[in-house]
Amino acid sequence: MGRRRRFTQQSTSDDDDDKAAAEPPKTAKPAVPSSSGAKKQPRRHADEEEDEDEEDELELEDEEDDEKDLEEMRRNEEEERREETRTRRRRGRKPKRAVEESDEEPEEKKAESDEEEEEEVREEDSTEAVPVGDPVKVTGKGKKQRKHYASFEYEGNTFELEDPVLLTPEQKNEKPYVAIIKDITEYDGSLSVTGQWFYRPEEADKKGGGNWTASDTRELFYSFHIDDVPAESVMHKCVVHFIPLNKKIPSRKEHPGFIVQKVYDTVAKKLWNLTDKDYEDNKQHEIDLLVKKTMDRIGELPDREPTDTPGDNTDQFPNKRGLRKRPMNPIDVSRDATGKSEHFVKPETPGSDNLKHYAILAKFKVLTTATYRDKWLDKLLDTIPLTSNEGAGAAHADPVSVAKISNNGSSALDTSSVDNENSYAPDVVVSIMASLEKSTYDSLGSDFQKYNQKMRKLEFNIKNSPVLRTRLMNKELDPPVLLTMSPAELKAGLTPAEKTSEPEESRRLQMTDARCERCTEKKVGISDIIHAGHGDRYQLECISCGHTWFSSRDAISSLTVDAPSTGGNVGTAPWATAKFDVLQKQLASPRDQPDNKPGTDALQKSTAPSMPKLEKQKSFTKPKPEEPSAPTLEKQISFTKSKLDEPFVPTTLIKQKSFPKPKSQEPSARSADHE
């Protein structure tokens, strides 16, 4: 029976069937002796039939058990395959080919396994980033060749240039990175993305240590840091709003997304305002473009009051100037109200906030919703005299001024005509000042301190510079031009182009015989004298090369005057020569000379020393009581006068020159006596 069970179980081969057919006669031999074989023949057949029935039942049971075992094995194999594919998908590895199944596996299950393999291949293909379209440019050659694309596709999503995206962080506990796609490159078969990074406040380091605290959970810091990452690290797109500091932040429900109001300097580790105008030209254009895109997407945002503007949390210094004091109402201390203008609005007027020209500003509809802007408009309007104010002042003039005007007559008419020329119509003044304030607010409105400083500077220069005020009112200067002018240019009332084109005024310099240290030319003059405690210092300037330096008084030996090219020679006139002599003596010993001496005194003083010297020489060389003849004395006087044109000579040298002359006359006198 054991052999027959084994035969029924292994019925898959034809050779086994042949062997099994030959085996039954061997096992069918009777075990009893031959003597009793004939009697028990029918009984044996009955027993064999019963045994065969039992064996058939057992074989059926065994076959059913075997089929159950096979089905269970197949289920286990399918579960193992599915688990393996799941783990491979999570790890991102390519799945292995399915193990070949036996011939007994049904065709339906084979088809299902083929479909699963195709899906796995599709999923594997979708995990790789693929560029879209042709490359926009190619850089490098050979192995270093790089292809640049405008977009790429990854996991069914398409990403383009300038798209803000989230990137996979390095650590699982970190938040996703945020960047703007600036370039898409393919190198050596792999696709990479160049991103310009954003920083979260808790990720940005301070210069002195630590991190910044976020004013909003959505806040990010913009930066100019650029780095390359694999294209597969891109998760999905996001929205970033660039909001100036003077605008209110939109609500999270209406406009979800990140908020950027600061720029993080990764090198200096400092923060800058988004709307500062101190960036480089290309970076400034980039920031302005991002702000413009935000405004086009979400619309115009309402202004934020300066007191609500968050202070700069940079580590540069504590911003004490940002704490503005509440302005106090001006107190009127005048005894009478006769000289007041009729346009001055009372403090109890609603909405005026003590503006002097509130009625004019309201009439021409230039008032803004911001109080501080209206105050600056009122101050600018107060710098220009208005024709209506002039008439009002004349109507409310006091009797004393009227009496003075009647007594002066024509002089009063002249002054009134000058005032009328300098006064302007209110509509002209209001339009110009409103344009000036608006241009200042558009450029510096995000920073209240810079706006306040610029308005104070403009108000001061317009009030104190008649040239600037006249040119501005005559529309020779546009209001936006005043924002680019320096304090010196505002004071002169000239633009940079006009100031450079203006010819320089010729200067008269006291020239010296010193030599320039740079060009070694003898064209050095004194441009300035600095009076110090121990001695005067002289600032010398070379006319040839423009080099300037400081020197002591000892370095100056002689002085001349550098006259303009159009004038004549200054040293030819006798009085000018006398003045130069005085200057020489003053420079030689400035403390010995009196302050105010006319030129005639200097001439007499220069000629006086020669006379007593001649008398001393006469008395010293006089052998007899005879005096020198008149012609000799006249020659000596003319000789000393002619020396005025020469440089200053010490007195000892004059004595030596005048000493030999009386000696030349002594032999002639003695010879006359002998004769």
Curated annotation (Swiss-Prot):
The gene is RVR1. PROSITE patterns: BAH, TFIIS_CENTRAL. Expressed constitutively. SUPFAM superfamilies: Elongation factor TFIIS domain 2. Residues 71-86, 333-346, 499-512, 613-627 have a biased composition (Basic and acidic residues). The lineage of its organism: Eukaryota, Viridiplantae, Streptophyta, Embryophyta, Tracheophyta. GO terms for cellular component: nucleus. It comes from the Eukaryota. CDD domains: BAH_plant_3. Residues 372-518 form the TFIIS central domain. Keywords: Nucleus. One of its GO terms (molecular function) is DNA-binding transcription repressor activity. Disruption phenotype: Precocious accumulation of VRN1 associated with reduced levels of the repressive chromatin modification H3K27me3 at VRN1 locus (similar to vernalized cv. Bd21-3 plants), thus leading to vernalization mimick and VRN1-dependent rapid flowering without cold exposure in daylengths longer than 12 hours. Global transcriptome equivalent to vernalized plants. GO terms for biological process: DNA-templated transcription; negative regulation of gene expression, epigenetic; negative regulation of transcription elongation by RNA polymerase II; positive regulation of vernalization response; regulation of photoperiodism, flowering. This is Protein REPRESSOR OF VERNALIZATION 1. Signal peptide: none annotated. Component of a grass-specific mechanism of vernalization, a process by which prolonged cold exposure provides competence to flower in daylengths longer than 12 hours. Negative regulator of flowering required for vernalization establishment by repressing VRN1 before vernalization and in the fall season. Residues 1-143, 300-349, 493-512, 587-675 are annotated as: Disordered.
